Amino acid sequence: MTLTVHQFPCLSDNYGYLVRDESSGRTACIDTPDAAAILTELGRLGWGLDLVLNTHWHADHAGGNAEVKAATGCELLGPAEVTGRFPVDRVLAPGETVTLGETEFQVLESGGHTLGHIAYFVPSAGAAFVGDTLFALGCGRMFEGSPAQMWASLQRLAALPDATRIYCAHEYTASNARFALAVDSDPAVKARAEAVFAARERGEPTVPSTLAEEKATNPFLRAPRLRPGLPPHEAFAALRSEKDGFRG
């Protein structure tokens, strides 16, 4: 079976994702950051839309739900926290599986950025759609969750196969790279940062990355090494606090 991932930029720094199970022709959209952009891409590709898979309740992830559903008739799926804010037809919980044709999406708990944030892992495609939990060389701010919750979510993602492609929701990588360079002198971090800066100079995306790259260079996954002597979630919290105030 084959899953085609169509990635496109939208809003100021978001990425939209249309994913198509080629065996059935069924298509899903990961989040609805920009309804107009999503509908334009669907029209350009000649695809219909069957499902929306929300990761969390923020408007740049679920704000297009109503317009996209009205235009396509798709089914809206997402975590309970989206309900009451934006339309949802079916509430998903961690541990569930969503089927798109022959492709299975495993629903993973990934709270911390928001309390009920979820991610989607597609074993057959070696892909994870992680919303605002894990970024290339970074992670999401904790608007609602605790450091312990966010650290547990990051460890859950880090347990996926190393070859997993990480599709995050924003192009924040250059900024994240500057912070990584400030806190980690590992040569692998320097090499990756240089590659990121060069890619952005060429106008190229830095997403997706692989989980192996993140485990080797992402300071938030390396927090216990970078802040030794602290419990892992406290080491993570210290780095996240530094990043929140970083102006590099």
Label each region the model flagged.
Residues 138-164:
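Active-site-adjacent loop/tail segments of enzyme domains
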Residues 32-33, 57, 81-82, 113-114, ...:
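Active-site metal-binding loops of divalent metal-dependent hydrolases
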Residues 1-48, 119-131:
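Conserved beta-strand hairpin/beta-sheet module of binuclear metal-dependent hydrolase folds
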Residues 7, 18, 97-123, 127-128, ...:
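Core dinuclear metal-dependent hydrolase active-site scaffold
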Residues 12, 27, 34-109, 126, ...:
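Active-site HxH/HxHxD metal-binding segment of metal-dependent hydrolases
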Residues 155-165, 174-248:
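Accessory terminal helices/loops
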Residues 122, 130, 162-173:
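Anionic-ligand binding patches
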Residues 19, 31, 56, 68, ...:
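Divalent metal-coordination and catalytic microenvironments
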